[in-house]
Amino acid sequence: MVRQLILISSLLAAVAVRAPADPAHPMVTEAPDVNLVEKRATTCTFSGSEGASKASKSKTSCSTIYLSDVAVPSGTTLDLSDLNDGTHVIFQGETTFGYEEWEGPLVRVSGTDITVEGESDAVLNGDGSRWWDGEGGNGGKTKPKFFYAHDLTSSTIKSIYIENSPVQVFSIDGSTDLTMTDITVDNTDGDTDDLAANTDGFDIGESTYITITGAEIYNQDDCVAINSGENIYFSASVCSGGHGLSIGSVGGRDDNTVKNVTFYDVNVLKSQQAIRIKTIYGDTGSVSEVTYHEIAFSDATDYGIVIEQNYDDTSKTPTTGVPITDFVLENIVGTCEDDDCTEVYIACGDGSCSDWTWTGVSVTGGSVSDDCLNVPSGISCDL
């Protein structure tokens, strides 16, 4: 601001030199509008109960936005959509959210070349226990989704710590070339009495070139669920307490293609299953070029590895509308909690699962299924 005031003063001086005032008619010069100058500031800090509304209104006037101990009012989104190219958003302290039954999101970010990060002490606290009722998104209280990373291009989200989300956490949709690093979601409080549900870590749809590394997800649903998209990479992460690493469910959406996905170097702990591909009975789409590599898991409760082409109605014969091809498992080692866990279960439609390659796959401690259907050549449910 000081530099801008100096510039204004210099311009006024130049005008005075070029056009000397008539002593009989002295020139009157208006003072600069201080409020206007403030709006041009490149670094903006917003805090407290008015921080969210002020940030949403002033976001395009700032190249760097600090959100310091912001208290977002109930039923309100911390709206950082349509940011100017290159905007840098930094969370400081504790961001909190008022209570209301609504769908959310609590936070929304979109734009090009955007960086969103949290300082070392920053936490986005959803205080989800106010909504948790064991129903998740399937009934009971209407619960707000947490963080929409929609329509982001060539952007980065890093060092974000989210605590106790009411329901799903990150929704990644319509984004391209997005990198997410060192994301922590801690919903362990929701394990009490199984009150938290549908607290997916990352739901990905209609997005390309998404890279997620260094995540730690403690939740009660999919750690990652890729419903559609291409060129997606998830690595060097820990998933605990949820439903593991999932493709799908695929089908029933505008975009039902999943292609070129890699999960690498992930530990899956105490989850329903470690590896899952689920496609919708009777729908169409495709799943291809999916690789799980160097995955370690322990104490799976329901399945070690499960592939279902009748996900929404397992009583029906799997259908062929969403073929699963070029599916690679390499160096997968894990354990089931007990015999109630099925080590491997495959339910494919007739001829709709092909070109699978599994090497170095070991699942122990559970039961072996004798109900697998249309298992591809070279693959077995009895490892």
Swiss-Prot record:
Pfam families membership: Glyco_hydro_28
Propeptide: 17-40
Main location: secreted
Keyword Isomerase in annotation: no
Bridged cysteine pairs (disulfide): 44-62, 223-239, 348-353, 372-381
Transmembrane segments: none
Keyword list, A-Z: Cell wall biogenesis/degradation, Cleavage on pair of basic residues, Disulfide bond, Glycoprotein, Glycosidase, Hydrolase, Repeat, Secreted, Signal, Zymogen
Active site: 221, 243
Residues carrying sugar: 260
Reactions performed catalytically: (1,4-alpha-D-galacturonosyl)n+m + H2O = (1,4-alpha-D-galacturonosyl)n + (1,4-alpha-D-galacturonosyl)m
E.C. number: 3.2.1.15
GO molecular function, one term: polygalacturonase activity
Gene Ontology CC terms: extracellular region
Family designation: Belongs to the glycosyl hydrolase 28 family.
Name under which the protein is recorded: Probable endopolygalacturonase C
